């Protein structure tokens, strides 16, 4: 199909965040959410052992459907999402061929679920919460994770002046690596030693977007752009942005029109475009209510 025959979404970059950690859904809210996702996703979310994980997964699915409904103007109940063999969600069905360059990705960890979407670029997003490791010391934790980073990256992590700053730099590097892996959709089989990040600046301010970090793949500097932002003093978000091959020489890019920052959505924002796709299932609420929010060990550590 020729490019001129394809639709390009009239949108800029999208950055949304939802505080799923503090979200305490009512019975009506949770049952409405269950009606607004695909049956297989409803079932998958219902199998989580803890409500924290179920809420995060539900928020992620709703964010994906919202961005497609709002930005591509596809009715919510006509959106069909599938996963690649490596687990990356994508839009399928008749509408997907009309917007072949539209990309989106979600991540949830800590207190937030986040979404990044682009009209004409590859995108991967990851969020990491800086927190103390469970039962091991920071040094033991770093030892166990030694193979995930290059020597230069470990030098950057260990150069920080206290344990918390070192842990924070660790999770910053981790989010960067995960954002790239998610953008290219290769899953867990990718050797993380092949990619190396040169982070800049060392210190970040909350709410400010940074684009100075560089990535090297097999020792060669790449042209990918990495956006970084601190949502608060514990949550670091990294967004990997790469060119779609057949659009590399087109200018200007829609996604470069405006600076992108994260918009914090509330539950009403999240559901404003939602259209239920199934009947209400009261047992789904009973199942949700029967679960603990967190594992016992994590509840004690708070």
UniProtKB/Swiss-Prot annotation:
Subcellular location: Cytoplasm, Cytosol
GO biological process: fatty acid biosynthetic process; lysine biosynthetic process via aminoadipic acid; protein maturation
Cofactor: Mg(2+)
Entry binding sites for Mg(2+): 126, 178
Keyword annotations: Cytoplasm, Magnesium, Metal-binding, Transferase
Transmembrane segments: none
Annotated CoA binding sites: 44, 83-88, 105-108, 178-182
Catalyses which reaction(s): apo-[ACP] + CoA = holo-[ACP] + adenosine 3',5'-bisphosphate + H(+); apo-[ACP] + acetyl-CoA = acetyl-[ACP] + adenosine 3',5'-bisphosphate + H(+)
Manner of cofactor binding, per the entry note: Binds 1 Mg(2+) ion.
Top-level EC class as recorded in UniProt: transferase
Subunit structure: Monomer.
PANTHER family for the chain: L-AMINOADIPATE-SEMIALDEHYDE DEHYDROGENASE-PHOSPHOPANTETHEINYL TRANSFERASE, PHOSPHOPANTETHEINE TRANSFERASE
Family of the protein in this entry: Belongs to the P-Pant transferase superfamily. AcpS family.
Protein name: L-aminoadipate-semialdehyde dehydrogenase-phosphopantetheinyl transferase
Organism listed in the record: Xenopus laevis
Highest classification ranks of the organism: Eukaryota, Metazoa, Chordata, Craniata, Vertebrata
Gene responsible for this protein: aasdhppt
């Amino acid at each position: 199909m020729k490019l001129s025959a394809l639709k390009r979404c009239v949108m800029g970059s999208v950055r949304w965040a939802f505080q799923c950690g503090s979200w305490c859904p009512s019975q009506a809210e949770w049952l409405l959410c269950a009606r607004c996702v695909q049956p297989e996703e409803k079932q998958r979310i219902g199998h989580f052992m803890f409500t924290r994980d179920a809420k995060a997964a539900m928020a992620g699915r709703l964010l994906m459907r919202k961005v497609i409904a709002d930005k591509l103007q596809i009715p919510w109940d006509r959106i069909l999402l599938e996963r690649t063999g490596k687990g990356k969600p994508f839009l399928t069905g008749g509408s997907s061929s009309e917007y072949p360059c539209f990309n989106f990705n979600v991540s949830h960890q800590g207190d937030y679920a986040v979404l990044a979407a682009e009209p004409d670029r590859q995108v991967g997003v990851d969020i990491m919460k800086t927190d103390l490791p469970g039962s091991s010391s920071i040094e033991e934790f770093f030892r166990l994770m030694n193979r995930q980073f290059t020597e230069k990256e470990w030098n950057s992590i260990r150069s920080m002046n206290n344990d918390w700053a070192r842990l924070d730099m660790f999770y910053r590097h981790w989010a960067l690596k995960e954002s790239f892996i998610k953008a290219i959709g290769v899953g867990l089989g990718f050797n993380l030693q092949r990619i190396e990040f040169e982070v800049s600046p060392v210190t970040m301010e909350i709410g400010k977007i940074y684009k100075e970090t560089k990535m090297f793949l097999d020792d060669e500097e790449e042209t990918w752009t990495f956006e970084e932002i601190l949502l608060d003093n514990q949550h670091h978000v990294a967004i990997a942005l790469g060119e779609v091959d057949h659009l590399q020489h087109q200018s200007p890019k829609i996604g470069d029109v405006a600076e992108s920052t994260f918009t914090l959505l509330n539950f009403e924002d999240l559901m404003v475009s939602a259209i239920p796709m199934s009947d209400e299932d009261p047992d789904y609420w009973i199942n949700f209510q029967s679960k603990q929010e967190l594992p016992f060990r994590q509840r004690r550590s708070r």
